[in-house]
């Protein structure tokens, strides 16, 4: 398995096990779009260290909690949305321990944030604890989600492209044209505000999982039902509260099974349908 495939599987597992509202399809599309941009498509899960002038400035920064010699480099940015500084590693540790009962200490072992066992947890923490971020994601407000993640609109066009790709694949469509035709939009292959609004609306109404990339899911005006399932992340005392539709849970489980090459004899029809489709999600 390639390092990228390993990271794909790890990120999917973290979202399933710890993501809570991130498992709602409209929110999941926003989350994946931001993490894919921030990590360069999962190529970078640790800050590239020079050190640059800015990185040398990490040393001794009280606002980052870097109070000991070497803290600047030791607590460099890690994860698919980078967590930087001793204070943030400590805060993340406290949140994971309190929320999930997990025995982990990112302050003591900062490299865990880039490990397969914990990759993605920092990004999940960021999304779940930043005021208004989940609400903006639920509303399909890509601009405000970007501002909350980035502080501005750096790389905004690339984030939009990632959103298009993630939303289309979550919905089971191969191209923008395919979706536009199905949604009754002008078929020009260009994803603009109207197409993205329609993508968000469709994600909000998914009630059945697609069987293949060419068989889009059925839309419904009813909310997705709860369908949480156990995971294989590090042991936790309690699962994160989640509101997930069968589409989201199936996507995560099916994607994980395919990506890690798991062989389970008793796969249900529900999971096996997703396994084939989800293999192409990040391609």
Task: For the regions a language model picked out, list residue spans one by one.
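Secretory-pathway/luminal and periplasmic proteins that interact with or process carbohydrate-rich
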Residues: 37-47, 133, 152-159, 186, ...
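Short acidic, glycine/serine/threonine-rich helix-capping segments at coil-helix boundaries
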Residues: 171-219
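Acidic helix/loop microenvironments that form the catalytic cleft of cell-wall polysaccharide enzymes
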Residues: 35-38, 136-155, 176, 181-183, ...
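Surface-exposed patches in mature extracellular/periplasmic domains of secreted proteins
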Residues: 19-31, 44-47, 133-146, 187
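Peptidoglycan-targeting cell-wall enzymes and recognition modules
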Residues: 1-10, 31-126
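Second-shell loop/turn segments in exported
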Residues: 1-2, 17-21, 30, 70, ...
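Long, repeat-rich segments with strong aromatic
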Residues: 111-120, 127-165, 244-251
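Cationic, hydrophobic amphipathic alpha-helical membrane-interacting segments
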Residues: 206-283
């Amino acid at each position: 398995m390639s390092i990228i495939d390993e990271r794909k599987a790890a990120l999917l597992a973290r979202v399933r096990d710890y993501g809570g509202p991130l498992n709602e399809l409209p929110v999941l599309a926003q989350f994946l779009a931001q993490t894919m941009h921030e990590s360069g498509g999962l190529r970078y899960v640790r800050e590239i260290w020079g050190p640059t002038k800015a990185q040398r400035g990490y040393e001794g920064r009280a606002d980052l909690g870097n109070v000991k010699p070497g803290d600047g480099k030791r607590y460099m940015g890690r994860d698919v949305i980078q967590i930087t500084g001793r204070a943030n590693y400590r805060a993340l540790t406290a949140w994971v321990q309190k929320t999930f009962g997990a025995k982990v200490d990112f302050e003591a072992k900062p490299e865990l944030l880039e490990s397969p066992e914990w990759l993605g947890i920092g990004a999940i923490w960021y999304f779940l604890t930043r005021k208004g971020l989940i609400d903006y994601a639920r509303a399909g407000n890509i601009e405000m989600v970007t501002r909350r993640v980035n502080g501005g609109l750096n790389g905004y066009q690339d984030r939009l492209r990632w959103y298009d790709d993630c939303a289309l694949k979550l919905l089971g469509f191969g191209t923008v044209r395919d979706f536009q035709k199905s949604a009754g939009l002008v078929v020009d292959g260009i994803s603009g505000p109207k197409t993205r609004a329609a993508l968000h609306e469709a994600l909000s109404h998914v009630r059945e999982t697609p069987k293949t990339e060419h068989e889009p899911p059925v839309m419904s005006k009813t909310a997705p039902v709860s369908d949480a399932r156990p995971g294989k992340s590090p042991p936790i005392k309690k699962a994160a509260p989640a509101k997930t539709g069968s589409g989201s849970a199936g996507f995560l489980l099916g994607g994980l099974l395919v990506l890690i090459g798991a062989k389970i004899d008793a796969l249900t029809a529900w999971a096996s349908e997703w396994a084939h489709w989800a293999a192409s999600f990040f391609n």
